[in-house]
UniProtKB/Swiss-Prot annotation:
Organism: Dinoroseobacter shibae (strain DSM 16493 / NCIMB 14021 / DFL 12)
GO biological process, one term: photosynthesis, dark reaction
Protein name (database record): Light-independent protochlorophyllide reductase subunit N
Stated role: Component of the dark-operative protochlorophyllide reductase (DPOR) that uses Mg-ATP and reduced ferredoxin to reduce ring D of protochlorophyllide (Pchlide) to form chlorophyllide a (Chlide). This reaction is light-independent. The NB-protein (BchN-BchB) is the catalytic component of the complex.
Family the UniProt entry places it in: Belongs to the BchN/ChlN family.
Presence of the UniProt keyword Metal-binding in the record: yes
């Protein structure tokens, strides 16, 4: 088996982190419903919020109302906000109407929003009451998608965390993959693990309620997304044990992630090499094509999705880029520690957001590529900076070997576009 790539320069695990608590510019956790409702095929997400919440979901999902999507919004009217109506009774009526019309729903999530949190609406009590009423056909859970103190990927974390306490108990030794991935990417991961003889493998979230995984003291789990800190804590409380590894972005990250699982399950070096050699070679070849554009280019990450640290590791080590600043909404060293170990010392690490101060640092650095939110991209482009929308990195399949070239290409394309525009202007 090929040995892991070693870092000559010291890593960033012990690098001082610049803490920022100023003005923020991010989407709220409701955004996670866009990919969760596609993954969980018999679940429904009922947001208790305002018309703004409804417009966000409708426009972001690109789903027509008549398509019967698996999400909706119970609108809080002025009388609800003023306390002139019993919001709990209103929720009961809406849920009863929904379930009578949609008997295919097996899991119902009551999702809190900024308005429901401001008026202290107890959705946990509503979920318990409604579960008693509609059990065993429907389980009702709740979580918050509010953007008051969170960023948009934390919606998935809150959703999965709400599921962990009600997962069935099991004594079986099983591998649990934690995090929502597109089906085609998840199938690739399961296929590689199956070829190594690793199993049984379960997934959280499961596509259907009847496939919900169990959890117990013999459960080991591997995390697919770096923003699932609270879900990991909930699994730890249930007795499960996490497999520590870098996240599976790029050839190196995917190999180290799979290697950690293989070692846990006693897979031989020969078997591991036989299973991974071909996809690793394809990944390296695909990355190399994009790396020609990215090599020796500088990059600046605004905090947005919590993917920033693993992506910076991938871009600096596999694509030859230089990171100036790597900002993340939250830095969970328990999860991204292995990626920090591989990220060579040098870039500023910042946690949280003070958007004006970060804009000043970005303008002073003049990076070749800036990864930021939608609201910052156009103004920075107007100032002559090349940008990449951070949210695209969440909605695009980017995990594991077969997507490694696509991941590198996402960063190469805006640089190529800028270079082409400069050539056209020069002509």
């Amino acid at each position: 088996m090929n040995k892991p790539v070693t870092t000559i320069a010291p890593g960033c695990r012990d690098t001082p982190i610049l803490k920022q608590r100023g003005q923020r510019e991010v989407f709220c956790g409701l955004t996670g419903i866009i990919w969760l409702h596609r993954k969980m095929q018999d679940a429904f997400f009922l947001v208790v919020g305002s018309r703004t919440c409804a417009h966000l979901l409708q426009s972001a999902a690109g789903v027509m109302i008549f398509a019967e999507p698996r999400f909706g919004t119970a609108i809080l009217e002025e009388k609800d906000l003023a306390g002139l109506a019993d919001a709990q009774d209103e929720i009961d009526r809406e849920v009863e109407r929904l379930l009578s019309r949609r008997p295919d729903i097996k899991q119902l999530f009551l999702v809190g929003s900024c308005p429901s949190e401001v008026i202290k609406l107890d959705l946990g009590r509503a979920a318990e009451r409604l579960t008693r009423k509609f059990a065993p056909h429907v389980r009702v859970l709740n979580y918050s998608g509010s953007g008051i103190e969170t960023t948009f990927t934390q919606g998935e974390d809150a959703c999965l965390e709400s599921m962990v306490p009600v997962l069935p108990e099991t004594e079986a030794r099983e591998l649990l993959l934690v995090g929502a991935l597109p089906d085609v990417v998840e199938d690739q991961a399961l296929g590689l693990l199956d070829k190594m003889g690793i199993g049984p493998v379960r997934v959280l979230p499961a596509p259907r309620a009847d496939g919900t995984p169990g959890v117990g003291p013999n459960t080991v789990y591997a995390v697919l997304q770096p923003f699932l800190g609270e879900t990991c804590s909930a699994l730890d409380r249930r007795g499960a044990r996490r497999i520590d590894a870098p996240f599976p972005f790029g050839e190196e990250g995917t190999t180290l992630w799979l290697r950690a699982i293989a070692r846990e399950f006693g897979v031989s070096d020969e078997t591991f090499e036989a299973v991974t050699a071909a996809p690793r070679a394809r990944a390296r070849k695909a990355i190399a094509a994009a790396a020609e554009t990215l090599r020796d280019k500088s990059i600046f990450f605004f905090p947005d999705s919590q993917l920033e640290i693993p992506l910076a590791r991938f871009l600096t080590r596999e694509c030859g880029m230089a990171a100036i600043e790597v900002g993340a909404p939250y830095i969970h060293k328990g999860l991204v520690g292995p990626d920090l170990d591989l990220l060579a010392a040098g870039p500023t690490l910042s946690e949280g957001q003070d958007v004006d101060m970060q804009l000043d640092r970005c303008r002073a650095a003049r990076p070749d590529l800036t990864v930021c939110g939608l609201g910052l991209a156009n103004p920075l482009e107007a100032e002559g900076l090349t940008t990449k929308w951070a949210i695209e990195l969440v909605f695009t399949p980017v995990h594991f070997y077969e997507q490694a070239g696509d991941l590198a290409g996402l960063f190469a394309r805006p640089i190529r576009r800028r270079e082409k525009l400069r050539l056209e202007v020069a002509e």
